[in-house]
């Protein structure tokens, strides 16, 4: 290490140690503009929200707080729910990390589901809303955390031995012809492209 050349711009280890002892390093989280005045911040936010509401009210001549049209350049008409595309009135999707708890679904120890959620037109009926599911029994909320951890995409296997990526098969099992003996499925290989030698 005696042949290592240290550039003149970098401080020696003695100077670095002395600097660290004199000036303790401040925390990485610093307040650059002084203490936060939460009351002023709240007032500014409320004022900004009111300004945005007024701007959108003037732009669209619609009172968004009371859900009523106003006089102006746009003419608002009430439209029936059935004449709109489905995405305007369907319930919003839960976030990706959220737990899905379908109604009346039970699960056994191995992780297999007993009843699944409604699919297709059954799930999109007008009577089915997220609000209705929330107003069910309050004791269903207690099992929510337990169900979130218990639901699996794949059922648990009964076999405790690890699965091999490639199954070992003997010629006896293959030639046996019985369905149980050679039940392991093998992926066919792609035929290699062979060049003609001329």
From Swiss-Prot:
Q: Where is this region: Interaction with CDK2?
A: 51-91
Residues with PTM Phosphothreonine: 157, 170, 187, 198
Where are residues bearing Phosphotyrosine located in the sequence? 74, 88-89
Q: What GO terms fall under cellular component here?
A: cytoplasm; endosome; nucleus
| UniProt feature, compositional bias: Basic and acidic residues | 13-22, 126-137
**Domain of life of the organism encoding this protein:** Eukaryota
Q: Which GO terms describe its biological process?
A: G1/S transition of mitotic cell cycle; negative regulation of cyclin-dependent protein serine/threonine kinase activity; negative regulation of epithelial cell proliferation; negative regulation of mitotic cell cycle
How is the protein modified post-translationally, according to the record? Phosphorylated; phosphorylation occurs on serine, threonine and tyrosine residues. Phosphorylation on Ser-10 is the major site of phosphorylation in resting cells, takes place at the G(0)-G(1) phase and leads to protein stability. Phosphorylation on other sites is greatly enhanced by mitogens, growth factors, cMYC and in certain cancer cell lines. The phosphorylated form found in the cytoplasm is inactivate. Phosphorylation on Thr-198 is required for interaction with 14-3-3 proteins. Phosphorylation on Thr-187, by CDK1 and CDK2 leads to protein ubiquitination and proteasomal degradation.
UniProt domain comment: A peptide sequence containing only AA 28-79 retains substantial Kip1 cyclin A/CDK2 inhibitory activity.
Stated family: Belongs to the CDI family.
Designated name of the protein:
Cyclin-dependent kinase inhibitor 1B
Taxonomy, top ranks, is: Eukaryota, Metazoa, Chordata, Craniata, Vertebrata
